[in-house]
Amino acid sequence: MAQKTTISVIKADIGSLAGHHTVHPDCMAAASRVLAEAKKNGVINDFYVTHVGDDLILIMTHTKGVDHPDVHGLAWEAFKKAAEVAKELGLYAAGQDLLSDAFSGNVRGLGPAAAEMEIEERPSEPIVIFAADKTEPGAFNLPLYKIFADPFNTAGLVIDPRLHDGFVFEVVDVFEDKGVHLNTPEELYDLLALIGTPSRYVIRRVFRKDGKIAAVVSVERLNLIAGKYVGKDDPVMIVRAQSGFPAVGEVLEPFTFPHLVAGWMRGSHNGPLMPVPVRDARPTRFDGPPRVIALGFQVKNAKLVGPSDLFDDPAFDEARRTANKVADYIRRHGPFMPHRLDPSEMEYTTLPQVLERLKDRFKPVKDLPVPKVKHSEMLSGAEEAHD
């Protein structure tokens, strides 16, 4: 049996230059040095370091399988070194996603987000790695549905015999830590009934009907781990493409629609997901709008060839213009829904504190008195004074 290759994409917010919008080059260099030493020592086969917004992203290939403590420990060490540099430079929110001081064999539950898949390499193994900033794991629900279940997006579902049987979606309830497998197209409506609530039901993995993995998403929610708001979850995703999977163009097509996602400023607002090249993955306006990058690689003998910055293409200019128009429109709502998230998503903001402070002032509607407000005497002196 051929040796399997593991692709691990692990990200963390370790501190940003001037607010929450980018990773300092020295932090990326610190992480790269850690990974280069690990590659030299045979812990990993290859790596690439990048960022989206203020999230440092480690892309690694190896042959150790998913959730391997050596690989996760390596990522943890790289993040710690980068965070040390961030603290030396006085960067904002240095080490924000590192919720523990001690590594326990796996980064899951400690703050960083991880998407990993173990595969038998095809003769040509193209993959696309997505990373988003200022949003949550459920932001990939709509694109994944379109990639793997919508024939209006993916022509291969109709005309490619290898895709025609459909795919299996693994959906996770992130509140209850439970999951379910749903077959498409047979259970398409059941799938949509769940994933239309992306704050709770998140697509974690997609499989072909023969069991081969097609896509994987990080599903960690930092507020559920930390018990308070510590930043949005900023997911990463790996998607296999071509030769039995959707074509690269079909994988990218959903991002021509900058759909609304939760996150943006203080993780408490809906906004359009803007597809951008890495050089523009620096959200500034109202700490946004939310951004997503896409890097294309070939994987050969557990080594990375690439990347190609796939959203660095004028074909996505219109999506970016639309995202800016939507951002203009929805920002006009200020603190009102639907721009601001609903109360269930405001649990880790000031809303619970406000409600606690006002709880004794809430009364049954029928018992609410008419308020008496003292007015200043009008300058004209013509109006009557009020109590």
UniProtKB/Swiss-Prot annotation:
The name this protein goes by in its record: Fructose-1,6-bisphosphate aldolase/phosphatase
Binding site residues for Mg(2+) 1: D13, H20, D54, Q96
Family: Belongs to the FBP aldolase/phosphatase family.
Cross-referenced InterPro entries: FBPase_V, FBPase_V_sf
Natural source organism: Ignicoccus hospitalis (strain KIN4/I / DSM 18386 / JCM 14125)
Source organism superkingdom: Archaea
GO biological process, one term: gluconeogenesis
Obligatory cofactor(s): Mg(2+)
A Pfam family: FBPase_3
Residues that bind Mg(2+) 2: D54, D55, D133, D234
Pathway this chain belongs to: Carbohydrate biosynthesis; gluconeogenesis
Gene Ontology molecular functions: fructose 1,6-bisphosphate 1-phosphatase activity; fructose-bisphosphate aldolase activity; magnesium ion binding
Domain notes for this protein: Consists of a single catalytic domain, but remodels its active-site architecture via a large structural change to exhibit dual activities.
